[in-house]
C-alpha cells in the first residue's frame, strides 16, 4: 500500500471558507490557561451568587430559569476543572513511578 502526500489544495479558502491563513494566537503555556480558567470560573461563580442574592431581594430582576441554567454552567465548569486537576495528578504520579 502506497502512502500519498497530502494535497495542500484540499483545504483551500474557496473549498472551506472558515479555514483561514491568519495567525492564531495561542496562550503561552498550560499554567496560564489553567489559571485563566480558574479565574473565569471563580468570577462566574461570584456573579451567579450575586444574581441569586439580588433575585431574593428584588423578585422581578432575574428569572428562576436563568439562575438554574447559570448554576448548571458553573457546575460543569467546576467538574471540568476537577477532571483536569485529577488528570494532572495522575500524570504526575505516573511520571514519578517511572524507573530511570
From Swiss-Prot:
GO terms for molecular function: cytoskeletal motor activity; structural molecule activity. It comes from the Bacteria. The keyword Chaperone does not apply. It holds the Pfam family FliE. Its main location: other. It is found in: Bacterial flagellum basal body. One of its GO terms (cellular component) is bacterial-type flagellum basal body. GO terms for biological process: bacterial-type flagellum-dependent cell motility. InterPro entries: FliE. Keywords: Bacterial flagellum. Belongs to the FliE family. This is Flagellar hook-basal body complex protein FliE. The lineage of its organism: Bacteria, Pseudomonadati, Pseudomonadota, Gammaproteobacteria, Enterobacterales. The gene is fliE.
